[in-house]
Design a protein with these regions (language model features):
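N-terminal export/assembly segments and adjacent metallocofactor-ligating motifs
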Residues: 1, 13-225
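Structured interaction patches on ligand/partner-binding surfaces of diverse proteins
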Residues: 5-11
């Protein structure tokens, strides 16, 4: 029988087939159903997201099924953009907020086809108790949650890095390791790195507090007396 690999417990002597025609057809159907509720790839929050990369591998770009009703873009937060039109209800953001950062701001609400991710009591993100750690952004596979600095007015990503640099957060003494995404020698965004102190996690300062780099009072060369 077919079963999701994430819930099937292995047992001794089990034989697993992942590339049978039945399994591949089932995966394609799942992606086609998910694509039906997505904006087109060109208008999605992140055309280069994990979701669209996997969709391309599965050979699924369009769907024969009707889509859900469009959900308006939420730009109420200064640092993050919310486009639930691209959400696939995977619950990764919920778990990132609740289990990884233990903030418990994000949850699932409503039932059936109306089920969706909410902040607190279905408040706009910018009016919720969100502490802006950005763990949900790092976990999201579709771009439904994105750094505001990366998207245009329509909520589509337009800024991509040309290289990444491993670094350490300069604020407190914890020593959180970071992965800095750079374009034209300017920082676009920062992700958490799997270091011993932070294990991929960051706080609001580590993820979004890099504007000091452009401050006119910052020393960029050694001072010699």
């Amino acid at each position: 029988t077919l079963a999701a690999s994430c819930i099937r417990k292995p047992t001794e002597g089990m034989e697993v087939t992942v590339n049978s025609s039945r399994a591949e057809k089932s995966r394609s159907m799942v992606f086609e159903l998910l694509v039906s509720d997505q904006p087109s790839k060109e208008q999605s929050p992140d055309p280069d997201s994990k979701f669209w990369n996997w969709s391309e591998k599965m050979g699924v770009s369009t769907s024969r099924f009707p889509g859900k009703e469009k959900i308006n873009l939420d730009r109420s937060h200064k640092a993050m953009s919310v486009n639930l039109d691209a959400c696939i209800n995977c619950n990764l953001c919920v778990r990132a907020c609740r289990e990884v950062q233990v903030n418990d701001v994000i949850g699932m609400a409503y039932r059936g086809s109306t089920a969706k991710v909410i902040f607190d009591l279905d408040d706009p993100m910018g009016e919720s108790t969100c502490v802006a750690c950005g763990e949900c952004v790092q976990a999201c596979p579709t771009g439904a949650l994105m750094e505001s600095s990366l998207v245009n007015e329509e909520g589509t990503r337009v800024n991509y890095s040309d290289r990444t640099v491993d670094s350490v957060c300069p604020y407190c003494g914890v020593g959180c390791q970071t992965k800095v995404h750079v374009k034209d020698d300017k920082i676009l965004y920062v992700d958490g790195k799997d270091g011993p102190a932070n294990e991929n996690r960051l706080c609001v300062k580590g993820r979004f507090g890099f504007d000091y780099i452009k401050h006119e009072g910052r020393l960029t060369k050694p001072l010699i007396r």
